[in-house]
């Protein structure tokens, strides 16, 4: 899950922006 937070594309989904 750490990689998802680092990726700008998946960061939005992971952070639920």
Swiss-Prot record:
Glycoprotein in keyword set: no
Tissue expression remark: Expressed by the skin glands.
Annotated keywords: Amphibian defense peptide, Antibiotic, Antimicrobial, Disulfide bond, Secreted
Gene Ontology cellular-component terms listed: extracellular region
Major localization class: secreted
Similarity comment: family membership: Belongs to the frog skin active peptide (FSAP) family. Ranatuerin subfamily.
Name of the protein: Ranatuerin-2Ra
Organism the protein comes from: Pelophylax ridibundus (Marsh frog)
Taxonomy of the source species: Eukaryota, Metazoa, Chordata, Craniata, Vertebrata
């Amino acid at each position: 899950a750490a990689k998802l937070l680092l990726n700008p594309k998946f960061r939005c989904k992971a952070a639920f922006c």
